[in-house]
Amino acid sequence: MTQLSVVILAAGKGTRMYSDLPKVLHTVAGKPMVQHVIDTAKQIDAKQIHLIYGHGGELLQQRLSSEPVNWVLQAEQLGTGHAMQQAAPFFADDENILMLYGDAPLITKETLERLIAAKPANGIALLTVELENPTGYGRIIRENGSVVAIVEQKDANAEQLKIREVNTGVMVASGASFKKWLANLNNNNAQGEYYITDVIAMANQDGYKVQAVQASEFMEVEGANNRLQLAALERFYQKTQAEKLLLAGVRLIDPARFDIRGSLTHGKDVEIDVNVIIEGEVKLGNRVRIGAGCVLKNCEIGDDVEIKPYSVIEDAVVGKAAQIGPFSRLRPGANLAEETHVGNFVEIKNAQVGKGSKVNHLTYVGDAEVGSNCNIGAGVITCNYDGANKFKTIIGNNVFVGSDSQLVAPVTIADGATIGAGATVTKDVAENELVISRVPQRHIQGWQRPTKKKIAD
Protein backbone atom coordinates (compact mmCIF):
# COMPACT_ATOMS: atom_id res chain seq x y z
CA MET A 1 0.00 0.00 0.00
CA THR A 2 1.31 3.44 -0.96
CA GLN A 3 2.35 5.54 2.02
CA LEU A 4 0.59 8.82 2.68
CA SER A 5 1.82 12.20 3.90
CA VAL A 6 -0.40 15.16 4.66
CA VAL A 7 0.25 18.86 4.14
CA ILE A 8 -1.85 21.22 6.27
CA LEU A 9 -1.93 24.86 5.19
CA ALA A 10 -2.00 27.00 8.35
CA ALA A 11 -0.06 30.17 7.52
CA GLY A 12 -2.98 32.59 7.10
CA LYS A 13 -3.30 35.61 9.36
CA GLY A 14 -7.08 35.63 9.57
CA THR A 15 -7.51 39.39 9.23
CA ARG A 16 -11.30 39.14 9.24
CA MET A 17 -11.24 37.46 12.66
CA TYR A 18 -10.07 40.80 14.12
CA SER A 19 -7.92 38.91 16.58
CA ASP A 20 -4.30 38.61 17.69
CA LEU A 21 -4.74 34.84 17.64
CA PRO A 22 -3.68 33.04 14.43
CA LYS A 23 -6.79 32.02 12.52
CA VAL A 24 -6.27 28.27 12.80
CA LEU A 25 -6.06 28.48 16.61
CA HIS A 26 -9.64 29.72 16.92
CA THR A 27 -11.70 26.90 18.35
CA VAL A 28 -14.58 24.70 17.29
CA ALA A 29 -16.03 22.51 20.05
CA GLY A 30 -13.33 23.70 22.43
CA LYS A 31 -10.44 22.61 20.20
CA PRO A 32 -8.33 24.69 17.77
CA MET A 33 -9.45 24.24 14.18
CA VAL A 34 -6.03 23.03 13.11
CA GLN A 35 -6.05 20.43 15.91
CA HIS A 36 -9.21 18.92 14.42
CA VAL A 37 -7.41 18.60 11.07
CA ILE A 38 -4.30 17.07 12.64
CA ASP A 39 -6.42 14.54 14.52
CA THR A 40 -8.21 13.54 11.30
CA ALA A 41 -4.86 13.18 9.51
CA LYS A 42 -3.76 10.78 12.23
CA GLN A 43 -6.93 8.73 11.77
CA ILE A 44 -6.05 8.05 8.13
CA ASP A 45 -2.57 6.84 9.16
CA ALA A 46 -0.53 9.65 7.66
CA LYS A 47 3.16 8.76 7.77
CA GLN A 48 4.14 12.42 8.07
CA ILE A 49 2.21 15.64 8.67
CA HIS A 50 3.77 18.79 7.23
CA LEU A 51 2.34 21.94 8.83
CA ILE A 52 2.79 25.15 6.82
CA TYR A 53 2.99 28.10 9.20
CA GLY A 54 3.51 31.84 8.88
CA HIS A 55 1.59 34.46 10.86
CA GLY A 56 1.70 33.76 14.58
CA GLY A 57 4.04 30.85 14.03
CA GLU A 58 5.63 31.04 17.48
CA LEU A 59 2.26 30.81 19.23
CA LEU A 60 1.16 28.05 16.86
CA GLN A 61 4.26 26.00 17.64
CA GLN A 62 3.75 26.61 21.35
CA ARG A 63 0.13 25.43 21.31
CA LEU A 64 0.93 22.36 19.18
CA SER A 65 4.27 21.52 20.77
CA SER A 66 3.23 17.95 21.56
CA GLU A 67 2.21 17.17 17.98
CA PRO A 68 4.70 15.18 15.84
CA VAL A 69 4.51 17.48 12.82
CA ASN A 70 7.15 18.77 10.42
CA TRP A 71 7.09 22.56 10.71
CA VAL A 72 7.47 24.29 7.33
CA LEU A 73 7.77 28.08 7.21
CA GLN A 74 5.97 30.14 4.57
CA ALA A 75 7.59 33.51 5.20
CA GLU A 76 5.47 35.29 2.59
CA GLN A 77 1.88 34.32 1.91
CA LEU A 78 1.84 34.18 -1.89
CA GLY A 79 -0.96 31.69 -2.41
CA THR A 80 -1.76 28.04 -1.90
CA GLY A 81 0.65 26.91 -4.59
CA HIS A 82 3.45 28.87 -2.93
CA ALA A 83 2.62 27.20 0.39
CA MET A 84 2.89 23.75 -1.19
CA GLN A 85 6.19 24.73 -2.81
CA GLN A 86 7.66 25.20 0.67
CA ALA A 87 6.77 21.62 1.63
CA ALA A 88 7.75 20.01 -1.70
CA PRO A 89 11.40 19.30 -0.75
CA PHE A 90 10.09 16.89 1.90
CA PHE A 91 7.97 14.84 -0.53
CA ALA A 92 9.06 11.32 -1.46
CA ASP A 93 8.42 10.50 -5.12
CA ASP A 94 6.60 7.25 -4.37
CA GLU A 95 4.25 8.49 -1.65
CA ASN A 96 0.84 10.11 -1.94
CA ILE A 97 0.50 13.70 -0.75
CA LEU A 98 -2.85 14.88 0.64
CA MET A 99 -3.42 18.62 0.89
CA LEU A 100 -5.67 19.91 3.70
CA TYR A 101 -6.52 23.27 5.26
CA GLY A 102 -6.07 24.23 8.89
CA ASP A 103 -9.18 26.41 8.91
CA ALA A 104 -11.52 23.67 7.63
CA PRO A 105 -11.86 21.58 10.80
CA LEU A 106 -14.82 19.33 10.02
CA ILE A 107 -13.40 17.24 7.19
CA THR A 108 -14.09 13.60 8.02
CA LYS A 109 -11.99 10.47 7.93
CA GLU A 110 -14.60 8.77 5.74
CA THR A 111 -14.54 11.52 3.09
CA LEU A 112 -10.75 11.52 2.94
CA GLU A 113 -10.65 7.74 2.62
CA ARG A 114 -13.06 7.95 -0.34
CA LEU A 115 -10.88 10.61 -1.93
CA ILE A 116 -7.65 8.65 -1.50
CA ALA A 117 -9.25 5.46 -2.82
CA ALA A 118 -10.42 7.34 -5.94
CA LYS A 119 -6.96 8.67 -6.86
CA PRO A 120 -5.87 7.41 -10.31
CA ALA A 121 -2.50 5.69 -10.47
CA ASN A 122 -0.89 8.61 -12.30
CA GLY A 123 -3.31 11.41 -11.61
CA ILE A 124 -5.08 13.56 -9.05
CA ALA A 125 -8.14 13.01 -6.91
CA LEU A 126 -9.90 16.29 -6.21
CA LEU A 127 -12.61 16.95 -3.63
CA THR A 128 -15.48 19.09 -4.93
CA VAL A 129 -18.91 20.17 -3.75
CA GLU A 130 -22.00 21.53 -5.51
CA LEU A 131 -23.48 24.76 -4.12
CA GLU A 132 -26.69 26.69 -4.65
CA ASN A 133 -24.65 29.88 -4.45
CA PRO A 134 -21.05 29.25 -5.55
CA THR A 135 -19.95 32.91 -5.33
CA GLY A 136 -16.37 33.22 -4.14
CA TYR A 137 -15.30 29.69 -4.98
CA GLY A 138 -13.12 28.30 -7.76
CA ARG A 139 -15.27 26.69 -10.48
CA ILE A 140 -14.70 23.15 -11.74
CA ILE A 141 -14.26 23.19 -15.53
CA ARG A 142 -15.12 19.92 -17.25
CA GLU A 143 -14.82 18.63 -20.79
CA ASN A 144 -16.69 15.43 -21.64
CA GLY A 145 -17.22 14.86 -17.93
CA SER A 146 -13.54 15.04 -16.99
CA VAL A 147 -12.05 17.84 -14.88
CA VAL A 148 -9.70 19.91 -17.03
CA ALA A 149 -9.21 23.05 -14.94
CA ILE A 150 -10.24 25.11 -11.92
CA VAL A 151 -10.91 28.80 -12.47
CA GLU A 152 -10.88 31.15 -9.49
CA GLN A 153 -13.81 33.54 -9.02
CA LYS A 154 -11.72 36.61 -9.92
CA ASP A 155 -10.49 35.02 -13.15
CA ALA A 156 -13.76 33.41 -14.30
CA ASN A 157 -15.76 34.62 -17.29
CA ALA A 158 -19.55 35.01 -17.31
CA GLU A 159 -20.25 31.44 -18.43
CA GLN A 160 -17.84 29.93 -15.93
CA LEU A 161 -19.46 31.90 -13.10
CA LYS A 162 -22.70 29.97 -13.73
CA ILE A 163 -21.05 26.67 -12.76
CA ARG A 164 -22.20 25.35 -9.36
CA GLU A 165 -19.59 22.65 -8.82
CA VAL A 166 -16.71 24.22 -6.92
CA ASN A 167 -13.27 23.33 -5.68
CA THR A 168 -12.76 22.62 -1.98
CA GLY A 169 -8.97 22.83 -2.25
CA VAL A 170 -8.52 19.29 -0.94
CA MET A 171 -6.59 17.04 -3.31
CA VAL A 172 -4.24 14.08 -3.39
CA ALA A 173 -1.48 13.19 -5.88
CA SER A 174 1.89 11.49 -5.85
CA GLY A 175 4.93 13.26 -4.44
CA ALA A 176 6.71 13.05 -7.80
CA SER A 177 3.79 14.65 -9.64
CA PHE A 178 3.35 17.42 -7.11
CA LYS A 179 7.05 18.31 -7.21
CA LYS A 180 7.01 18.48 -11.01
CA TRP A 181 3.90 20.65 -11.22
CA LEU A 182 4.79 22.92 -8.30
CA ALA A 183 8.12 23.74 -9.95
CA ASN A 184 6.24 25.05 -13.00
CA LEU A 185 3.66 27.25 -11.26
CA ASN A 186 3.49 30.95 -12.15
CA ASN A 187 1.58 33.92 -10.78
CA ASN A 188 0.09 35.23 -14.03
CA ASN A 189 -3.36 35.93 -12.62
CA ALA A 190 -5.44 38.78 -11.21
CA GLN A 191 -4.12 38.28 -7.68
CA GLY A 192 -0.48 37.78 -8.58
CA GLU A 193 -0.45 34.58 -6.50
CA TYR A 194 0.62 31.00 -7.08
CA TYR A 195 -2.54 28.90 -7.24
CA ILE A 196 -2.37 25.20 -6.41
CA THR A 197 -5.40 24.79 -8.65
CA ASP A 198 -3.18 25.35 -11.71
CA VAL A 199 -1.81 21.83 -11.26
CA ILE A 200 -5.14 20.51 -12.58
CA ALA A 201 -4.48 21.98 -16.02
CA MET A 202 -0.87 20.73 -15.86
CA ALA A 203 -2.06 17.21 -15.09
CA ASN A 204 -4.34 17.31 -18.12
CA GLN A 205 -1.49 18.55 -20.31
CA ASP A 206 0.59 15.60 -19.12
CA GLY A 207 -2.25 13.24 -20.01
CA TYR A 208 -3.02 12.40 -16.38
CA LYS A 209 -6.56 11.80 -15.21
CA VAL A 210 -8.20 14.15 -12.70
CA GLN A 211 -10.83 12.32 -10.67
CA ALA A 212 -13.41 14.45 -8.83
CA VAL A 213 -15.04 13.16 -5.64
CA GLN A 214 -17.94 15.10 -4.15
CA ALA A 215 -18.07 15.76 -0.42
CA SER A 216 -21.27 14.47 1.18
CA GLU A 217 -21.81 17.70 3.12
CA PHE A 218 -20.63 21.22 2.33
CA MET A 219 -19.99 22.13 5.97
CA GLU A 220 -17.30 19.48 6.33
CA VAL A 221 -15.16 21.33 3.77
CA GLU A 222 -16.18 24.85 4.78
CA GLY A 223 -13.44 27.09 6.15
CA ALA A 224 -13.77 29.88 8.69
CA ASN A 225 -12.48 33.28 7.61
CA ASN A 226 -14.54 35.29 10.10
CA ARG A 227 -16.37 34.74 13.36
CA LEU A 228 -19.73 34.37 11.65
CA GLN A 229 -18.43 31.40 9.66
CA LEU A 230 -16.76 30.07 12.81
CA ALA A 231 -20.09 30.19 14.65
CA ALA A 232 -21.77 28.37 11.76
CA LEU A 233 -19.17 25.59 11.96
CA GLU A 234 -19.70 25.35 15.71
CA ARG A 235 -23.48 25.03 15.35
CA PHE A 236 -23.19 22.44 12.59
CA TYR A 237 -20.76 20.39 14.66
CA GLN A 238 -22.95 20.55 17.76
CA LYS A 239 -26.07 19.66 15.77
CA THR A 240 -24.29 16.64 14.30
CA GLN A 241 -23.06 15.45 17.70
CA ALA A 242 -26.50 15.91 19.27
CA GLU A 243 -28.13 13.89 16.49
CA LYS A 244 -25.68 11.03 17.05
CA LEU A 245 -26.48 10.98 20.77
CA LEU A 246 -30.23 11.07 20.16
CA LEU A 247 -29.99 8.16 17.75
CA ALA A 248 -27.93 6.27 20.34
CA GLY A 249 -30.70 6.60 22.92
CA VAL A 250 -29.70 9.68 24.94
CA ARG A 251 -32.56 12.02 25.75
CA LEU A 252 -31.56 15.63 25.12
CA ILE A 253 -34.37 17.88 26.34
CA ASP A 254 -33.40 20.47 23.70
CA PRO A 255 -30.68 19.37 21.26
CA ALA A 256 -30.10 22.99 20.20
CA ARG A 257 -29.05 23.85 23.75
CA PHE A 258 -26.41 21.22 24.36
CA ASP A 259 -22.67 21.52 23.72
CA ILE A 260 -20.09 18.76 23.56
CA ARG A 261 -16.41 19.71 23.48
CA GLY A 262 -14.81 16.32 23.71
CA SER A 263 -16.18 12.78 23.82
CA LEU A 264 -19.14 11.28 25.66
CA THR A 265 -19.70 7.59 26.34
CA HIS A 266 -22.96 6.63 27.98
CA GLY A 267 -25.26 3.87 29.16
CA LYS A 268 -29.00 3.51 28.67
CA ASP A 269 -31.77 5.97 29.55
CA VAL A 270 -29.50 8.96 30.10
CA GLU A 271 -31.33 12.29 30.29
CA ILE A 272 -29.63 15.66 29.78
CA ASP A 273 -31.43 18.95 30.35
CA VAL A 274 -30.73 22.25 28.57
CA ASN A 275 -27.46 24.23 28.52
CA VAL A 276 -25.29 21.33 29.66
CA ILE A 277 -21.65 21.41 28.51
CA ILE A 278 -19.55 18.25 28.13
CA GLU A 279 -15.77 18.78 27.98
CA GLY A 280 -12.89 16.32 27.58
CA GLU A 281 -13.67 12.64 28.16
CA VAL A 282 -16.90 12.05 30.05
CA LYS A 283 -18.39 8.64 30.91
CA LEU A 284 -22.01 8.31 32.03
CA GLY A 285 -23.55 5.13 33.41
CA ASN A 286 -27.13 3.95 33.01
CA ARG A 287 -30.06 6.15 34.00
CA VAL A 288 -27.94 9.22 34.73
CA ARG A 289 -29.91 12.47 34.93
CA ILE A 290 -28.16 15.80 34.43
CA GLY A 291 -29.96 19.03 35.28
CA ALA A 292 -29.88 22.32 33.43
CA GLY A 293 -26.70 24.38 33.23
CA CYS A 294 -24.25 21.71 34.42
CA VAL A 295 -20.64 21.47 33.22
CA LEU A 296 -18.95 18.05 33.18
CA LYS A 297 -15.27 17.73 32.29
CA ASN A 298 -13.11 14.60 32.29
CA CYS A 299 -15.28 12.73 34.76
CA GLU A 300 -16.88 9.34 35.33
CA ILE A 301 -20.46 9.15 36.57
CA GLY A 302 -21.96 5.88 37.84
CA ASP A 303 -25.40 4.36 37.31
CA ASP A 304 -28.50 6.11 38.68
CA VAL A 305 -26.70 9.33 39.58
CA GLU A 306 -28.69 12.54 39.63
CA ILE A 307 -26.79 15.76 39.00
CA LYS A 308 -29.01 18.69 39.82
CA PRO A 309 -28.87 22.05 38.01
CA TYR A 310 -25.79 24.26 37.79
CA SER A 311 -23.28 21.81 39.18
CA VAL A 312 -19.68 21.67 37.92
CA ILE A 313 -17.75 18.39 37.92
CA GLU A 314 -14.13 18.26 36.75
CA ASP A 315 -11.63 15.38 36.86
CA ALA A 316 -13.80 13.55 39.36
CA VAL A 317 -15.47 10.17 39.91
CA VAL A 318 -19.05 9.81 41.18
CA GLY A 319 -20.32 6.42 42.36
CA LYS A 320 -23.68 4.76 41.78
CA ALA A 321 -26.91 6.37 43.01
CA ALA A 322 -25.19 9.52 44.25
CA GLN A 323 -26.99 12.85 44.33
CA ILE A 324 -25.11 15.99 43.38
CA GLY A 325 -26.25 19.60 43.58
CA PRO A 326 -27.79 21.92 42.83
CA PHE A 327 -24.86 24.35 42.65
CA SER A 328 -22.22 21.80 43.70
CA ARG A 329 -18.60 21.87 42.59
CA LEU A 330 -16.47 18.75 42.38
CA ARG A 331 -12.88 19.71 41.63
CA PRO A 332 -10.00 17.53 40.42
CA GLY A 333 -9.41 14.49 42.60
CA ALA A 334 -12.91 14.31 44.06
CA ASN A 335 -14.00 10.68 44.37
CA LEU A 336 -17.47 10.00 45.72
CA ALA A 337 -18.59 6.48 46.60
CA GLU A 338 -22.06 5.18 45.86
CA GLU A 339 -25.14 6.68 47.50
CA THR A 340 -23.35 9.84 48.60
CA HIS A 341 -25.12 13.19 48.77
CA VAL A 342 -23.39 16.46 47.93
CA GLY A 343 -25.66 19.47 48.12
CA ASN A 344 -25.88 23.14 47.29
CA PHE A 345 -22.77 25.31 47.48
CA VAL A 346 -20.53 22.42 48.49
CA GLU A 347 -16.99 22.25 47.09
CA ILE A 348 -14.97 19.03 47.18
CA LYS A 349 -11.36 18.90 46.00
CA ASN A 350 -8.85 16.04 46.08
CA ALA A 351 -10.99 14.14 48.55
CA GLN A 352 -12.65 10.75 48.92
CA VAL A 353 -16.16 10.53 50.37
CA GLY A 354 -17.36 7.11 51.52
CA LYS A 355 -20.58 5.25 50.81
CA GLY A 356 -23.75 6.88 52.08
CA SER A 357 -22.06 9.98 53.46
CA LYS A 358 -23.77 13.34 53.17
CA VAL A 359 -22.24 16.76 52.63
CA ASN A 360 -25.36 18.75 52.01
CA HIS A 361 -24.82 22.48 52.49
CA LEU A 362 -22.25 25.28 52.20
CA THR A 363 -19.18 23.16 52.90
CA TYR A 364 -15.57 22.87 51.73
CA VAL A 365 -13.88 19.47 51.85
CA GLY A 366 -10.34 19.54 50.47
CA ASP A 367 -7.40 17.13 50.76
CA ALA A 368 -9.46 14.76 52.87
CA GLU A 369 -10.72 11.22 53.38
CA VAL A 370 -14.29 10.91 54.60
CA GLY A 371 -15.53 7.47 55.63
CA SER A 372 -18.93 5.89 55.08
CA ASN A 373 -22.24 7.02 56.60
CA CYS A 374 -20.89 10.35 57.79
CA ASN A 375 -22.85 13.58 58.08
CA ILE A 376 -20.94 16.78 57.42
CA GLY A 377 -23.02 19.75 58.55
CA ALA A 378 -23.56 23.13 56.94
CA GLY A 379 -20.63 25.52 56.90
CA VAL A 380 -17.96 22.93 57.75
CA ILE A 381 -14.47 23.64 56.43
CA THR A 382 -11.42 21.41 56.25
CA CYS A 383 -8.67 23.95 56.84
CA ASN A 384 -6.07 22.31 54.61
CA TYR A 385 -3.71 25.20 53.82
CA ASP A 386 -1.47 27.16 56.17
CA GLY A 387 -0.36 29.67 53.56
CA ALA A 388 2.60 27.58 52.43
CA ASN A 389 1.70 23.88 52.55
CA LYS A 390 -1.39 21.70 52.33
CA PHE A 391 -2.33 19.04 54.88
CA LYS A 392 -4.79 16.17 55.06
CA THR A 393 -7.94 15.62 57.11
CA ILE A 394 -9.00 12.03 57.80
CA ILE A 395 -12.56 11.33 58.95
CA GLY A 396 -13.58 7.77 59.88
CA ASN A 397 -16.92 5.99 59.47
CA ASN A 398 -20.18 7.08 61.11
CA VAL A 399 -18.81 10.49 62.07
CA PHE A 400 -21.11 13.46 62.69
CA VAL A 401 -19.58 16.91 62.16
CA GLY A 402 -21.82 19.71 63.38
CA SER A 403 -22.47 22.92 61.49
CA ASP A 404 -19.89 25.69 61.26
CA SER A 405 -17.00 23.51 62.44
CA GLN A 406 -13.41 23.98 61.32
CA LEU A 407 -11.18 20.93 60.99
CA VAL A 408 -7.60 22.22 61.05
CA ALA A 409 -5.37 19.79 59.17
CA PRO A 410 -3.45 17.66 59.73
CA VAL A 411 -6.08 16.03 61.89
CA THR A 412 -7.77 12.62 62.23
CA ILE A 413 -11.29 12.01 63.51
CA ALA A 414 -11.89 8.36 64.35
CA ASP A 415 -15.00 6.23 63.79
CA GLY A 416 -18.19 7.21 65.56
CA ALA A 417 -16.94 10.58 66.79
CA THR A 418 -19.24 13.58 67.11
CA ILE A 419 -18.07 17.14 66.57
CA GLY A 420 -20.36 19.71 68.16
CA ALA A 421 -21.51 22.69 66.13
CA GLY A 422 -19.04 25.56 65.94
CA ALA A 423 -16.04 23.49 67.06
CA THR A 424 -12.51 24.26 65.96
CA VAL A 425 -10.74 20.89 65.89
CA THR A 426 -6.95 21.08 66.04
CA LYS A 427 -6.16 17.73 67.69
CA ASP A 428 -6.98 14.14 66.76
CA VAL A 429 -10.32 12.78 68.01
CA ALA A 430 -10.65 9.20 69.29
CA GLU A 431 -13.47 6.75 68.54
CA ASN A 432 -16.93 7.70 69.79
CA GLU A 433 -15.69 10.91 71.45
CA LEU A 434 -17.73 14.09 71.58
CA VAL A 435 -15.81 17.29 70.91
CA ILE A 436 -17.20 20.65 71.96
CA SER A 437 -15.17 23.78 71.42
CA ARG A 438 -17.16 26.91 72.07
CA VAL A 439 -17.33 29.91 74.37
CA PRO A 440 -19.79 29.34 77.28
CA GLN A 441 -23.12 30.99 76.62
CA ARG A 442 -23.80 34.14 78.68
CA HIS A 443 -27.18 35.74 79.47
CA ILE A 444 -27.23 39.50 80.14
CA GLN A 445 -30.50 40.74 81.59
CA GLY A 446 -31.93 44.08 80.54
CA TRP A 447 -29.74 44.47 77.50
CA GLN A 448 -30.79 47.20 75.11
CA ARG A 449 -29.62 47.44 71.56
CA PRO A 450 -27.96 50.70 70.50
CA THR A 451 -30.15 53.19 68.66
CA LYS A 452 -29.21 55.34 65.72
CA LYS A 453 -28.23 58.89 66.51
CA LYS A 454 -29.87 61.60 64.48
CA ILE A 455 -27.45 63.88 62.69
CA ALA A 456 -28.28 67.54 63.08
CA ASP A 457 -28.99 69.50 59.91
From Swiss-Prot:
Q: Which PROSITE patterns match?
A: HEXAPEP_TRANSFERASES (PS00101)
GO cellular component terms, semicolon-separated: cytoplasm; membrane
InterPro entries recorded for this chain?
A: Bifunctional_GlmU (IPR005882), GlmU-like (IPR050065), GlmU_C_LbH (IPR038009), Hexapep (IPR001451), Hexapep_transf_CS (IPR018357), MobA-like_NTP_Trfase (IPR025877), Nucleotide-diphossugar_trans (IPR029044), Trimer_LpxA-like_sf (IPR011004)
Sorted alphabetically, the keyword list is: Acyltransferase, Cell shape, Cell wall biogenesis/degradation, Cytoplasm, Magnesium, Metal-binding, Multifunctional enzyme, Nucleotidyltransferase, Peptidoglycan synthesis, Repeat, Transferase
Q: Does the keyword Transferase apply?
A: yes
**Region of interest called N-acetyltransferase, as start-end residue ranges on this chain:** 249-457
Residue ranges for the region (Pyrophosphorylase) are 1-227
The record's annotation in CDD domains points to: GT2_GlmU_N_bac, LbH_GlmU_C
Write down the required cofactor(s).
Answer: Mg(2+)
Q: GO molecular-function annotation terms?
A: glucosamine-1-phosphate N-acetyltransferase activity; magnesium ion binding; UDP-N-acetylglucosamine diphosphorylase activity
Q: Where is this region: Linker?
A: 228-248
Biological process terms from the Gene Ontology for this record are:
cell morphogenesis; cell wall organization; lipid A biosynthetic process; peptidoglycan biosynthetic process; regulation of cell shape; UDP-N-acetylglucosamine biosynthetic process
**Catalytic activity line of the entry:** alpha-D-glucosamine 1-phosphate + acetyl-CoA = N-acetyl-alpha-D-glucosamine 1-phosphate + CoA + H(+); N-acetyl-alpha-D-glucosamine 1-phosphate + UTP + H(+) = UDP-N-acetyl-alpha-D-glucosamine + diphosphate
- In the UniProt entry, which residues are flagged as the active site? 361 (proton acceptor)
The free-text note explaining how the cofactor binds reads:
Binds 1 Mg(2+) ion per subunit.
- UniProt xrefs under SUPFAM superfamilies: Nucleotide-diphospho-sugar transferases, Trimeric LpxA-like enzymes
Subcellular location, record wording: Cytoplasm
- Signal sequence coordinates: none
Q: Which residues does the record give as Mg(2+) binding sites?
A: 103, 225
Question: What does the UniProt record say this protein does?
Answer: Catalyzes the last two sequential reactions in the de novo biosynthetic pathway for UDP-N-acetylglucosamine (UDP-GlcNAc). The C-terminal domain catalyzes the transfer of acetyl group from acetyl coenzyme A to glucosamine-1-phosphate (GlcN-1-P) to produce N-acetylglucosamine-1-phosphate (GlcNAc-1-P), which is converted into UDP-GlcNAc by the transfer of uridine 5-monophosphate (from uridine 5-triphosphate), a reaction catalyzed by the N-terminal domain.
Q: Which HAMAP family match?
A: GlmU (MF_01631)
How it assembles, according to the record, is: Homotrimer.
Which named protein is this? Bifunctional protein GlmU
Taxonomic lineage of the native organism: Bacteria, Pseudomonadati, Pseudomonadota, Gammaproteobacteria, Pasteurellales
Encoding gene (name): glmU
